[in-house]
Amino acid sequence: MSALVAYLCNKIILKSFQDEGLTVLVPLLEEMAKTTFAFSLKTSIIGTHFIFGCIEGIYDIFTSSKKIGKWAAVASILSHSFFGMITYLTYTKTNISFIAILVSWIFHSGWNWYVVKKL
């Protein structure tokens, strides 16, 4: 569900804000969606992020070139799993979901900036 919400909103954000949307708004939206759904459904934060990464990875395979599609998929799975671990660890230390989302957003935003600007 979080992947569907993110997909629909990301299309609007990317049309309106281009690279800035991808490096600032998309990570915020995705971290909010993943973590909010995990809390709402009382399920694993890390697991939710992992499944999101798998869904994004499948999307990457079908929408990227054959040369980079599989690597983009691996990067999606690993990065979203990492963001899930960051979210979980921050939440267990602070017990404040807003702080957990904020910290994971910073990491996610930094990752997207690196991908957009350096790769």
Task: Name every feature range the model reports, one short phrase each.
Residues 1-119:
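Hydrophobic alpha-helical segments at protein termini of multi-pass membrane proteins
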